[in-house]
Amino acid sequence: MTASSRGSSAATASREHIGYENGVLGGVSSAVQALTAPGEKILVHSPTYVGFTHTMADNGRVLVHSPLVRDENGVWRMDYADMDAKLKRHHIHLAILCSPHNPCGRVWERWELERAMEVYAANDCLVISDEIWSDIIMPGHKHIPTQSVSADARERTMAFYAPSKTFSLAGLIGSYHIIYNTYLRDRVVRQSEVSHYNDCNVLSLHALLGAYSPAGEEWADEMCRVIDANHEYACNFIRDNFKGVRVMRPEGTYMLYLDCADWCRKHGVTIRELQERG
């Protein structure tokens, strides 16, 4: 892999560590079913990708949210004390980490991931790391695979990737996991097999190979530069024309996360009403 290996831990993986999934959400669902029981709680950061919300509800699991917080520079950060408290209070042993984070666009720095993994390890919590956005990284930032930050993280984490976001291949179906821990890998693979849907198709396989070629990497690099310019334009436009709406320029992904709380207070509307007007 070329385009993928710059953003994933594939460069250090052997053949047996990599497995096919029809989609990242499908792989996440298989891991959740393999490692938890209905009614168990799973830790996620909020704001939360709506796909996690729906998938966990469909599987009968309960999400516990640890809200991201802004630092003094307006950068969204994980709240490690809150994570630790909720893992302990709710006896949680499985967490989902979105890296880069959707929807706020954070590309977690190594120290942030190291500290998060220390919290998970201290609470005997396994980690599902959704890294589907790892190739859409803006200039000046670098994706750090969760599994790369420590020996414990390598064994504790199940990482999921796909070319679908980067190369608009979602309609063809196809993603993959990287799981180094043999026990965890066997559990996830077995759960994926019993679903009877997790079979690779030839068209998506060749699309992935084409995407993860030198030409695909060149295309992805150019796309990231275009997205970065679009981010700059959009953020400037929002700040100039929508007073009270806060926006942080994304470090990764093509998502813009708008904080409309001040705007809503000023105009006497709720977030729900604003969504309905949209």
Functional labels for PLM-detected ranges:
Residues T2, R6-G278:
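PLP-dependent class I/II
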